[in-house]
Amino acid sequence: MALPNKPLGELKAVRDPEVEEREVDILIVGGGMACCGTAFEVKKWMDEGQSVLLCDKAAMERSGAVAQGLSAINTYIGDNAPEDYVRMVRNDLMGIVREDLIFDLGCHVDDSVHLFEEWGLPVWKKTEDGKNLDGKKGQTMGTLKGGAQPVRTGKWQIMINGESYKRIVAEAAKLAIGEENVLERVFIVELLLDANKENQIAGAVGFSVRENKVFIIKCKSMMVACGGAVNIYQPRSVGE
């Protein structure tokens, strides 16, 4: 459950904040699309008795780049070939790519889009006479998985009503691992290494952005996806 946006009263920094220690098998750092997907998938592979915790410095329903809402999904292969998608990405990124990873994405990305639609994401559809139906009306045409044709804005993009895109995916993540295993408003600032094993992750330290509290979380495995990757390259428009 998300804490209120505004703390009740002024939070004063003190020398000795409350310290809470936790220990889990799997720690997921971040609350954007990547970590929501991780939370949904990891539950399928966890053994009975294993524990997981997701830490987000904001509230999952409105955190990350997708929280602003989107009008399109940039990659839906559909009737196209994954090999063509690899060629497009390779050209777009000036050859600095892992073609095997791109090909795998092209082979499986449609399954993720089908899941989003099953969870409630409205996708625009084409009618048999070529008319465009927006998300709500498009539902009358059936699902993409069932063979309905999406409305495209290019070769790879499909149109959606994505105002609540992130809320839909965050809800699926919370249902998968349980809300009690989601820690919101906690900013992870330091990763911890095992004292006895070189380069072995052992945990993380963070602080609450709403309470005067520090968290020390021990773990055996960690997934870190805190965004910002879109800033690795400048836009193509600058001619880099």
What are these language model-derived features?
Residues K44-E48, I73-I77, V238-E240:
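A glycine- and small-aliphatic-rich helix-loop capping segment at beta-alpha/alpha-beta transitions
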Residues E20-V24, E211-S221:
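Core beta-strand elements of the Rossmann-like FAD/NAD(P) dinucleotide-binding domain
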Residues A2-L8, R15-E18, E23, Q50-S51, ...:
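Conserved N-terminal/central alpha/beta ligand/cofactor-binding core
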Residues I28, M33, V205-F207, I217, ...:
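Mobile, glycine-rich extracellular loop/lid and propeptide segments
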Residues V24-L54:
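N-terminal Rossmann-like FAD-binding beta1-loop-alpha1 element of flavoenzymes
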Residues G37, S63-G64, F215-I217, I232-Q234:
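Short helix/loop capping segments that flank catalytic or ligand/cofactor-binding pockets
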Residues S221-E240:
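Glycine-rich loop(s) and the adjacent beta-strand/alpha-helix scaffold that form part
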